[in-house]
Amino acid sequence: MTKYSQARLNSIIVKFILGVIILSLILSTISIYINRDFEKYIATVNGEKISFNLFKKMYFIEREKQKKILGKNFFKFSHNENFTKETYNYVLSQLINNVLLEQYAKNMNYLEVNDNTIKKIIYNSPIFQKNNKFSKERYLNYLTSINSTNHEYINIIKKKINTENLIHTISKSNFILKKEEKNIIKLLSQKRIIKKAIVKIDPSIYKKNITNQEAQIYFKKNQDNFYIPEKFKINFVELKTDNFKIHCENKEIYDWYIRNITQYSTKEKRRYSIIQVKNKQQAISILSRLHNTPEDFSKIAQEQSTDPISSKKDGDIGWISIDLIPDEIKHANLNKKNQISDVIPFHNEFLIVKLNETQIGTQKKIYEVFDSIKKQIKQKKSLDLYNELKNKISNNLKNDPGKIERILKENNILIQETDWFDKKSIPKVLNIPILKQFIFNKKLFQKDTTVKPQFHFIVLKKNQSFLIKIKKFKNKEIQHFENVKKNIIKKLRFIKAIKETKKKSEEIIYDLTQGRKKLFKQSNLYFTDPEIISRYDLSAITSIVFSLPHPQKGKKIYTLYNDKNKNFIIISLEKVYNTNFSEKEKNVILEYLSRHNTEIIFNSILKDLREKSIIKYENIVNK
């Protein structure tokens, strides 16, 4: 039974073909393919038309899929012109791919579909069923509705199945040569031993002289970096349910308790064990044995029950609330402890059920839930007051904005004022994406100081809203050279230090490559202990290390990179070797490569088909 419950939750199986998404067109509703006498079409592929009606339906399917993937962000993207255009083009491209594959399957004289297969598909199609049986009348009515003959309909089904078989064959037939397998495994199992030496920036370099002319040239070239950003001073009010002081009388708590008394009671629960078998005769035999030795229930459940979960727990399926007990078990009328049912038919299998325990429902006393009810009442009152105030503010902003400050005063809510801030120093309470978008949008506030600024009302989620008024504003302005001169000199010294350290490091590497260590030792450098680097390491140097050639005949390979602290690191590649993968690891790698290979094959076929085909687009949607 537990197996059945889990199956219901996992009843939808999503199949996909790697790399190529056909938008479920391969065996999609055939009716939208049949009627070729349409007035509008979106494209022709080698003379075969793709109807605009079909495009609209597939576009709708794709949009629904996007909704599920993007969730709440869907509506933000759906109004984006580029996003909409990309979706149009994507759907159209997949429709064209589908037609190309159909034509390819036909030209290859692909395996002819057996007539019995076609017959089986039609006979088992739900739309042609009546009372769980094939209805010829429904079938003929359907053909009439789509303006098709029986022969045309069968040919369409054949075309769809041939295309599906083609895709299936391609996806199954890809392979990797044994030699290629070995090379890839060897490449992925490779490890490298390195040593590192850190070349730090010499502090004395920071004392180098920088002329006034150098500083001025840098200032002029990088003026965009020397602006004082625009600044804001804001009046704001944060409205939350916490703004209100709420009182709650004992009578209110008592009334709430009486009104919602069912919420404060626990329902009766029952604990059952089951034995589930597929054969009725086996169930009857087990029941007969239990009549003689009921204490064997757990043992039999463990040994013979087909339910994979409860059989491991001696048949125990746990506690079930009285309102959630399946009807089949309810009708067995088990009311006594250790009472065993007769054989119960259950979803093509058979159950024997035992009642282990019963837990009677209880009613909580008011003192047990007093604090919880008090909290609920306060939350409700706060929410009601918040919504009332929110609506009042919203209405007055439209009709009489001058009243806003009086409304706030009546509710003992103070207007707060910020200090000057810019985009990098926004107060924490206002550091919310929607608020920042509003504050820094110059079109939404008045910079003319002769006009009195007005409040703007922004409603957020979770019962929170803000009244915001831009009180003062300062435009960004260029800083004077003298005010930033010290910072520029410091910056130029650092740039020079980096250049000189890099030059020195490159000279050391050249020396080491020639087999000399004099400059290395003069710089008081040393190599760290050996490190083993794998291709799967997430280190910043992994790609650098594996881009180096193999050391030859005892010679080491050297390279240089700059770390996050601006130090230069000399890397010495000492050794390259391979480890052995387990068979399981090899299979995982080869399976991934096989899938990737499938994608390449599909893309190659489609690219070739497009190049050889005549595809014409109509001006119905953006191409």
From Swiss-Prot:
Cytoplasmic membrane side: 1-11
Primary localization: membrane
Topology with respect to the bilayer: Single-pass type II membrane protein
Cellular compartments annotated: Cell inner membrane
Listed Pfam families: Rotamase, SurA_N_3
Cysteine disulfide partners in this protein: none
Residues in compartment: Periplasmic: 33-623
Keywords: Cell inner membrane, Cell membrane, Chaperone, Membrane, Transmembrane, Transmembrane helix
Annotated transmembrane regions: 12-32
GO molecular function terms listed in the Swiss-Prot or TrEMBL record: peptidyl-prolyl cis-trans isomerase activity
InterPro entries, sorted: PPIase_dom_sf, PPIase_PpiC, PpiD_chaperone, Trigger_fact/SurA_dom_sf
Domain PpiC residue range list: 267-357
The keyword Transmembrane belongs to this UniProt entry's keyword annotation: yes
GO cellular component entries: plasma membrane
Functional note: Chaperone that functions as a gatekeeper on the periplasmic side of the SecYEG translocon. Facilitates the translocation of precursor proteins across SecYEG by interacting with the translocating substrate. Also plays a role in the release of newly synthesized secreted proteins at the periplasmic exit site of the Sec translocon.
Record note on quaternary structure: Interacts with the SecYEG translocon. Binds to the lateral gate of SecY. Forms a complex with YfgM.
Family the UniProt entry places it in: Belongs to the PpiD chaperone family.
Name assigned to this protein: Periplasmic chaperone PpiD
Organism whose genome encodes this protein: Buchnera aphidicola subsp. Acyrthosiphon pisum (strain APS)
Lineage, opening ranks: Bacteria, Pseudomonadati, Pseudomonadota, Gammaproteobacteria, Enterobacterales
